[in-house]
Amino acid sequence: MDNKYTMKTKFFITTLLFLIGGLCLKAQTNDTDTQKAIATLKEFYKVIYDDNLGRKEEQFLKYVSKELFNKVFPPSPPGEDNSPGYDPFIQAQDYEAKTLNRSLKITSLGNDRYRVCFLLSDWEKKKTCVDYQLKKNNKGKYMITNILSDKNFYIRPKK
């Protein structure tokens, strides 16, 4: 009789250990994905909002989905400018690159959503925050697919 309970106990403990191990592995994967997404956002701001570079479509498309890029920068006929009156990625027109990148703070909001906060200049006291959704592309690289905090550029999920 003791042997029967011992086997059940061993089976229960073994099953419990497998479940705990699986949960730990999933948590590590989620943490790694979060770190990769945050690194993508840091790199985006460093590359795009650098004083020494002119912003080009190719640079944006390394970090921003084509759908979001076309919503933010719609194609316009020659001689016309259909671009927004502000930059939705910084919620402003003007910024100081060094201050912006030095003050950059990125936090995960869960479910592939992230909040990026920064100062636009040294004289600014209030941080600007922008909420994003990032998703992996077919190559496994995180891309900014939505600006959640800007109703002008929010892309409604497809049903």
What is each stretch, according to the model?
Residues 25-50:
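Short, low-complexity N-terminal intrinsically disordered segments enriched in polar/charged residues
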Residues 42-57, 65, 122-123:
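Generic signature of mature, soluble extracytoplasmic domains
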